[in-house]
Amino acid sequence: MLDLVAAFIALTTLLTYVNYRFIRLPPTIGVMATALVFSLIVQGLSELGYPILEVEMQEIIRRIDFSEVLMTWFLPALLFAGALHVDLSDLRSYKWPIGLLATAGVLIATFVIGGLAYYTFPLFGWQVDFIYCLLFGALISPTDPIAVLGILKSAGAPKPLATTIVGESLFNDGTAVVVFAIILGILQLGEAPTVSATAILFVQEAIGGVVFGAVLGYGVFVMMRGIDQYQVEVMLTLALVIGGAALAARLHVSAPIAMVVAGLIIGNHGRHYAMSDETRRYVDKFWELIDEILNALLFALIGLELLLLPFSWLHVAAAFALGGAVLVSRLLTVGPAILVLRRFRGANRQVPAGTIRILVWGGLRGGVSVALALSLPLGPERDLILSLTYIVVLVSILLQGLSIGPLVRRIYAGQPLEKSEGAH
């Protein structure tokens, strides 16, 4: 196991260096693109009669349980690190767009994408049951801000826009995981559960996650307030994430939601009432480093998964069609939500011009979608959905991620809007 971890970290570090030294793309996008090119080179060498490197790389990647690694270890830490730097007062200011997009938006997207997929699959010769189409809709609905947030900041996006994108993505991961789990349960049971059973499951996972995260966050906050030793306080935050995520799985509550809530408590109340200036610096630097390392590992793994996923040009064509369906669903969820806010709340100040375009095009899909696809039960539907999900995620990160910056600069060029900044 240690040799696997060492090999993967070494390869990711090399890819990160190559991107920073020669390619200069935004870090996460660059690492994934470099890993993708590396995968293509390895496959090319195999076609030329040198298969040994491809065989070795496939063995390394096959031994990594992407779904387990991301959902159990990476995602809780990434969400905690993201929430740690979100100002709670900003989140409250934009709670309506964030709340609508992270809850109703995920549900609407699940059914819109699922419905469009149901009618798209036969066009390419595939007959897929509607329940699998809904699973695809649920797993592809959460957005991933990691690749786009830094670009938005450097491009001068308004603070309300950046806050909405970050806030939505922090919570819609948890919502999507819960919705996915409910639909997967229906598939495995072979019959639809009652409304009361579905409601109980949702309350247990989502509300339970909020309560559990609040208890964890407040407990660690009290412990940090009683000491002034940055080494111990950093260890407390690390134990909160690792131990809290493991315990959440045992309690059958949403670990992603719990880590977001705990991160908000530590990043706001803990920062102001339980940390010295020295502790703040070390906690911030520690979690910034963890965030960068895990993101590099995650996006490198996404790029390297190409070595394991067989797909044809038919898959590529279908993925582009489904990518269009994802954008349509994004427009159908974002557009009405923003228009309603402007109409009934007079929210022009909170919803700058161009918000709909940026939210639609900036709604990148990421590792959570791939991890959920990998957790589907074995069968031809899983293989198909996994290949299509992977291509949709790749295209989303590369196409939308690399073009969102120029779009932001074009929309807000010359406008005296407040630029987004770090939360603290």
Swiss-Prot record:
Disulfide bonding pattern of the chain: none
Name of the gene this protein is made from: nhaP
One of the protein's GO biological processes: sodium ion import across plasma membrane
This protein's UniProt keywords: Antiport, Cell inner membrane, Cell membrane, Ion transport, Membrane, Sodium, Sodium transport, Transmembrane, Transmembrane helix, Transport
Compartmental location: Cell inner membrane
GO cellular component: plasma membrane
UniProt keyword annotation of Ion transport present: yes
Listed GO MF terms: potassium:proton antiporter activity; sodium:proton antiporter activity
Transmembrane segments: 3-23, 25-45, 66-86, 96-116, 130-152, 170-190, 200-220, 246-266, 296-316, 320-340, 358-378, 384-404
Annotated control of activity: Inhibited by amiloride.
PANTHER family: NA(+)_H(+) ANTIPORTER NHAS2 (PTHR10110:SF195), SODIUM/HYDROGEN EXCHANGER (PTHR10110)
Family: Belongs to the monovalent cation:proton antiporter 1 (CPA1) transporter (TC 2.A.36) family.
Activity vs pH: Optimum pH is 7.5. Almost no activity is detected below pH 7.0 or above pH 8.5.
Function recorded in the entry: Na(+)/H(+) antiporter that extrudes sodium in exchange for external protons. Also has weak Li(+)/H(+) antiport activity.
Bilayer topology: Multi-pass membrane protein
Gene3D superfamilies: 6.10.140.1330
Coiled-coil parts of chain: none
Name used for this protein in its record: Na(+)/H(+) antiporter NhaP
InterPro entries xref list: Cation/H_exchanger_CPA1, Cation/H_exchanger_TM
